Every structure is written in structure tokens, then in C-alpha cells.
Amino acid sequence: MNDSGVSKTYASALLGATNVPEEVEQELGDLAQLLFKDEKVKNFFLSPTVSNEEKEKVLIKNLRGKISDITLNFLGVLLNRGRIIHLPEIQKQFTVELDKKKGRVRAQVRSYPSLEPAQAAKLGSILSEKFKSEFILEVSEDKSLLGGFVVQFNDLKIEKSIASQLGEIKKSMLEKKLPVGAIYEN
């Protein structure tokens, strides 16, 4: 099974087993950062010379009472099956699966100039109405657009930027070649 298949399998299993998916989603995100951001911590948990029992003791000692039992047990399963390295990808896949279950769509919005919060909220509202889903917008500024915005989600791209409009005009002008010797007057 490839890495994305492993991640999807574990994420789906965890989502099916939990009664508090939003809490688990937050915990997985925090743990993925905690365990894989610091090189010493990452190396400890990925080291083949440290036993899984020792790794599990460290997790239990430091996390019991601070995260839900299901998340702690899940980490133990990942350790014992040699899958802890997949935690960051499992966390991402868990979020994808939870979003599907909740009818949410995460969209990347690039704009120039940067969207004001009210504009982003209005765009989210329009998208939600049009696509019958709750939209979570991840907004960033992109000066290469010259003006306007680009929205990307799933396999869809909505492009309303000056750069794309100029590209369309250029393409249109190049396609409409004038016949040799033709003279046009206004």
C-alpha cells in the first residue's frame, strides 16, 4: 500500500472510531507539529534503536490527560505498526475526510490586492450558495495577478484576475489574423 493509501486508511479508521472528530482533528494537528517540527523529538520517534515500548512510555508520560484517550491510543497503534512517520499525512487526510463528512470545502484564494475580511466573507458566502457546501477560505496575496482573484478547490479553478484577462485578450488577438492586403477602417 502506498503512503497516501496508508494515510487514508488510518485517517478513515480513526474518524469512524471517534465521537469527537473536531477535538481529534485539533490534537492530530498539534501532535504532527510537536513530533515532527523539532529534529531531536522527530529523530527519537523515528529511531529504530529506541524500542516502541520506550516511545510509548514517553508519549503516555507526557500526553496522558492532555489529549483524548482515543488519540493517545491511536498514537500507540501507529508506533506499534511502524506508521508514526505517517502522522503528518494522516492528520491532513483526517481533515479531508472530516470535511467531506461535514460538507465542508477548503478553497485557496489568491488575490491582489489582499482581500479584506468582509470581502473574503462575501466570497465564501457566494461560493457556499453556489456549490451548496460550507467553504473554508485560505486567503493569500499574489502580486503576479495584477488585480482580481483566483479560487481553487477540489479540481476546480475560478480565475477572475487581470493577468488571466490580459492573457485571453492576447490569445484572441493572435487567433484572429488579418488576411494579407486587407484594410479595415472604422
Swiss-Prot record:
Give the bilayer topology.
Peripheral membrane protein
Please give one Pfam family short name. Answer: OSCP
Q: Which domain of life is it from?
A: Bacteria
**InterPro entries in UniProt:** ATP_synth_OSCP/delta_N_sf, ATPase_OSCP/dsu
Keywords, comma-separated and alphabetical: ATP synthesis, Cell inner membrane, Cell membrane, CF(1), Hydrogen ion transport, Ion transport, Membrane, Transport
Keyword Ribosomal protein (UniProt): no
Example of a GO MF term: proton-transporting ATP synthase activity, rotational mechanism
**Mind naming one GO cellular-component term on file for this protein?**
proton-transporting ATP synthase complex
Q: How does it assemble?
A: F-type ATPases have 2 components, F(1) - the catalytic core - and F(0) - the membrane proton channel. F(1) has five subunits: alpha(3), beta(3), gamma(1), delta(1), epsilon(1). F(0) has three main subunits: a(1), b(2) and c(10-14). The alpha and beta chains form an alternating ring which encloses part of the gamma chain. F(1) is attached to F(0) by a central stalk formed by the gamma and epsilon chains, while a peripheral stalk is formed by the delta and b chains.
> By its UniProt entry, which NCBIfam families does this protein fall under?
ATP_synt_delta, PRK13434.1
> In its UniProt entry, what is this protein called?
ATP synthase subunit delta
Q: Which organism is it from?
A: Leptospira interrogans serogroup Icterohaemorrhagiae serovar copenhageni (strain Fiocruz L1-130)
Gene name for this UniProt entry: atpH
